[in-house]
Amino acid sequence: MIALSNALSRVFGSVAGYEFPSFIQKGINALYVKIFKIDLSEFEPLENYKSLNALFTRSLKKERPFDKTPNACIAPCDALITECAFLDNDSALQIKGMPYKAHELVGEINPLSPSFFYVNFYLSPKDYHHYHAPCDLEILEARCFAGKLLPVNKPSLHKNKNLFVGNERVALVAKDIQGNRLYFVAVGALNVGKMRFNFDKNIQTNAKAHLTQAYSYNPPIKVKKGDNLGNFEMGSTIVLFVQNTAFKDLKEKSVKFGESIGEFHAN
């Protein structure tokens, strides 16, 4: 199943990256925009994208404003928040009734502290596919886990136990503005050709070798709140684990990158 789902995603990625003649590509782009009801008001017009993948990975035409208050935590992406809560004995929910162990997702040996609050951000095919820093960060490590590329939509989350843990993913291990541990996990999915990270081009996902590896950064890579960390090549999921924060009531709400979703308490 791993080989099949990953192979399908690689094939889809190759097709999506193909540049058809402009008049054909414009029609393909227009159909995709219509099917998924994509709002292009913040982006270049659809005829500017030379491939479907270029449309998937579109950048904002101009910088989107965000809350620059130091203790504000912002949404890292445009997404639907499907679950959010404090960890319960290291358990988090991929969706209601489907728990998994948080330490397994991020690659730790020991259970995570119940002080961690987690948020699941589901990026659908219509969403802006880039992900950004939710606060000022020092990135210590990028842990890349080989795995399946199963869909991460709600029917699949209800059907497949430990889906996030079993799927290919990259877990960023970082320090937040207060020096507390923070995890930022990008989870792969079916038809997501790649997950890209701007701060390290060596990170390879959906590769044929199915390698699990870690990249350590000494000194840490410093990024500012709102900095573009990378992108999916279609929709997928970000899981954020943070400590010492107060979050708004977010479950089943759609958020936009830059929107304030909580704040860090003073240490």
From Swiss-Prot:
Pathway: Phospholipid metabolism; phosphatidylethanolamine biosynthesis; phosphatidylethanolamine from CDP-diacylglycerol: step 2/2. GO terms for cellular component: plasma membrane. Its cofactor is pyruvate. It is a peripheral membrane protein. Its main location: membrane. The active site is at residues 78, 132, 236. The keyword Lipid biosynthesis applies. The record marks 235-236 as: Cleavage (non-hydrolytic). It catalyses: a 1,2-diacyl-sn-glycero-3-phospho-L-serine + H(+) = a 1,2-diacyl-sn-glycero-3-phosphoethanolamine + CO2. It is found in: Cell membrane. One of its GO terms (biological process) is phosphatidylethanolamine biosynthetic process. Signal peptide: none annotated. Binds 1 pyruvoyl group covalently per subunit. InterPro entries: PS_Dcarbxylase, PSD-B, PSD_type1_pro. One of its GO terms (molecular function) is phosphatidylserine decarboxylase activity. It comes from the Bacteria. The keyword Lipid metabolism applies. Is synthesized initially as an inactive proenzyme. Formation of the active enzyme involves a self-maturation process in which the active site pyruvoyl group is generated from an internal serine residue via an autocatalytic post-translational modification. Two non-identical subunits are generated from the proenzyme in this reaction, and the pyruvate is formed at the N-terminus of the alpha chain, which is derived from the carboxyl end of the proenzyme. Heterodimer of a large membrane-associated beta subunit and a small pyruvoyl-containing alpha subunit. Catalyzes the formation of phosphatidylethanolamine (PtdEtn) from phosphatidylserine (PtdSer). Belongs to the phosphatidylserine decarboxylase family. PSD-B subfamily. Prokaryotic type I sub-subfamily. This is Phosphatidylserine decarboxylase proenzyme. It comes from Helicobacter pylori (strain Shi470). The lineage of its organism: Bacteria, Pseudomonadati, Campylobacterota, Epsilonproteobacteria, Campylobacterales. The gene is psd.
